[in-house]
Amino acid sequence: MTNQRKPKKALSVADVLSYKPKTIPFEGKWRDAIGLPELKGSWLIYGDSGMGKTSFAMQLGRYLCSINESLWFRTAYDSIEEGLSSSIQEAYKRTGMANVARRFLLLDKESIEDLQIRLKERRSPDVIFIDSVQYAELTRKTYKELVDMFGAKLFIFISHADGDKPKGALAQSIYYDANVCIYVHGFVANVTKSRYGGSGEIVVSESKRQEFWSIKQ
């Protein structure tokens, strides 16, 4: 006789009310746009190439590494699509990554399988950017398995766009599952979805924003 799978324990009212989420204490423009997010689950950043998507992701990563003097999160950026390159180097320089050198790691085209091994180690990153959805070789099933396997970590996926929507079935599935979704267009990051109370936008580069929108007009 095969062993029957037992359901997970149902949570009581007391269990729910006593839950203590591990929140990221965003401040300023980050709190206004996103709210007070938890260190868990997934986010999605999406947009066309050349619109400021990578620059915004780097700005967010740097902020997570230096929220205040006493609080920061180890962050890794898995550049599966591009890897170490001159454009990544320039993004580092623009963002001032030298100031958070010990807290921010670039993973050079690291596979999801190798990433899982890394995340099982002690003192592994708290936040992981995966760039991009289209090159990660994930399915909906393996995406969920990855996020659920490391329930105390935050995964931020980066995706190409098809118009103003994430490109492809997996990216669209992540959009519906993610706690925060951000569409980057014309060097403005628009928060299209947040389960943490935030709403609004963050300008990635004021000079490039003005240049882009002046041409559009």
Regions found by a protein language model. Give the residues of each.
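Charged, amphipathic alpha-helical linker segments immediately N-terminal to NTP-binding catalytic cores
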Residues: 1-20
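Active-site-adjacent loop/helix micro-motif of nuclease/hydrolase catalytic cores
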Residues: 52-56, 136-143, 166-167
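Alpha-helical scaffold elements adjacent to nucleotide-binding pockets in ATP/GTP-utilizing enzyme cores
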Residues: 87-91, 142-145, 173-177
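Phosphate-binding/switch region of NTP-binding enzymes
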Residues: 148-217
